[in-house]
Amino acid sequence: MIRICPIVRSKVPLLGTFLRSDSWLAPHALALRRAICKNVALRSYSVNSEQPKHTFDISKLTRNEIQQLRELKRARERKFKDRTVAFYFSSVAVLFLGLAYAAVPLYRAICARTGFGGIPITDRRKFTDDKLIPVDTEKRIRISFTSEVSQILPWKFVPQQREVYVLPGETALAFYKAKNYSDKDIIGMATYSIAPGEAAQYFNKIQCFCFEEQKLAAGEEIDMPVFFFIDPDFASDPAMRNIDDIILHYTFFRAHYGDGTAVSDSKKEPEMNADEKAASLANAAILSPEVIDTRKDNSN
């Protein structure tokens, strides 16, 4: 019987049967064994033996060869460090670029929720029923209205009432009037602010023309409403004790279209859906008498 190596016998058990001298498959099995032993390198060492390591005796190298090896090693380390530093600075640059793009909408979102920076609160989750109950107090807050128009916008934009007086928790409706003096249809967008800024956290707008862009045809004139209330917590805040006057200021800019969306010098607020608009109009029945009287005076 032809002898085969133990590794081949363990890997291919039937090969021993085929290698018997009386088997007609012996020549073919022998050729197969040689191919297996050659490919898996089983001729000279067993399966438990480790793969030979390629080593060399450094003492046989010349001084120049050793110096070249050291230079090669330092070059590889320097290349790795340079690549790491480049990756680090690229990551930092991308991070700051992303923060720069997200800073403006993030700032406006925070201001819309907290009233920071003189931005009135527009978070509709705060418009609960308990917030719309007027506080029983004799102190009314004077709300003054001001306006401004961008120099490149040929509009006239003015408040229809100079001021109204409201109680904390009392809803109020005011109007602005806008007219397009050009011979072309123009789309405008309004930004707003509250003064003093610390009172902005209590100024809540339920419905406002500034929530969406406004399109005026050539020569068209329209009334623009703003429906708002002062949070009842205003009356109990010691920091608001000496604040009797609040100014609501609007600035209109011309909208420009780049990628199909309108943009101005300031991002507009998210547009309310149909249900929210319907709820706002339904609440308009609770109006301040001062606003109604002022509205009538202006119409007369």
From Swiss-Prot:
- Membrane spanning residue stretches: 85-105
Q: What is its main location?
A: mitochondrion
Q: How does it sit in the membrane?
A: Single-pass membrane protein
One Pfam family assigned to this protein is CtaG_Cox11
Matching entries from SUPFAM superfamilies are given as:
Ctag/Cox11 (SSF110111)
Compartments (UniProt record)? Mitochondrion inner membrane
Q: Which residues lie on this side of the membrane: Mitochondrial intermembrane?
A: 106-300
For this record, an example GO cellular component is: mitochondrial intermembrane space
Q: Which domain of life is it from?
A: Eukaryota
Give the keywords, sorted: Copper, Membrane, Mitochondrion, Mitochondrion inner membrane, Transit peptide, Transmembrane, Transmembrane helix
Family per record: Belongs to the COX11/CtaG family.
Name the UniProt record assigns to this protein = Cytochrome c oxidase assembly protein COX11, mitochondrial
Q: Which organism is it from?
A: Saccharomyces cerevisiae (strain ATCC 204508 / S288c) (Baker's yeast)
Q: List the gene name.
A: COX11
